[in-house]
Amino acid sequence: MAPQGVEGFLESLKEYHNSDALSDVIVTCDGQEFKAHRVILSAHSKCFAKALNGDWKESSERRIDIKDFDPSIVEAMLRFVYSFEYTNTYGTSSMVFDAQMWQIADKYDIPALMAESKKKFEIAVATGWSMDDFPTAVAIVYESALPGLRDIVVVAASKNIEKLLDKDGFSELMRTTPHFTADLIPFLCGKPLGSMKLYKCPSCQMRFGGEFSVGPTYYCPYCSQARTNWSNYKTT
């Protein structure tokens, strides 16, 4: 007997992934084309809904061109919107792949995929923090404007800091990703991310966490702007 109710509907929905049946939009990435359906993309993503149902090029041409991600990430994202699951079958590190899945979900505002990729990423980091691609995953996490995965990598790094500092890749990460370093140092001192005050640099407009006393000079971890009055630039 065929599955009934929601389970049966979701099972049937998978059959429309990259299918000609009722397809009314094409998603392209690096020369590859994926057949999709406007109603499915719009239901998952306000970003896609706006692009496909407004006075935009994507709406008139029935085509969405994604340029900032590898086709494997785009394919996995599309598979998810039809099945609510994705798997990494491309030989990429799980940490890196899941971080990129969260990144594309963040960019295109797909809440369900953000939740799923965060869950997978947390598991991957817990088991793979000692691997050489951990710094790569951290760098991807800090490319996003949202802090969604940052607590995961900061906690993992703080718990294993002695072993990580022996790795050249991690040391280079701390030099090239100052926001990660700015989050990690207070955490190592026993101050979790949520307890830190948030500041917005008036020079470069970047936000960062910290604990600044009144009087001494402190520097923005991004642009190195020196100030003694950071209390005037607290933000949320």
What are these regions (language model features)?
Residues M1-I40, K67-V96, Y199-P202, F208, ...:
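N-terminal BTB/POZ boundary and linker segment
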Residues N53, I73, Y86, Y90-Q100, ...:
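Alpha-helical protein-protein interaction/assembly modules
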Residues D20, D24-E61, A76-L78, D109-K119:
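Alpha-helical oligomerization interface recognition
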Residues Y219-T236:
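Short microdomains enriched in Cys/His and/or Lys/Arg
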Residues Y199-C204, T217-C223:
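Short cysteine-rich clusters marking metal-coordination/redox-active sites
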Residues R207-S213, R227-S231:
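Short functional micro-motifs and their immediate structural scaffolds
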Residues S203-G209, S224, T236:
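Protein/peptide-recognition domains central to ubiquitin and immune signaling
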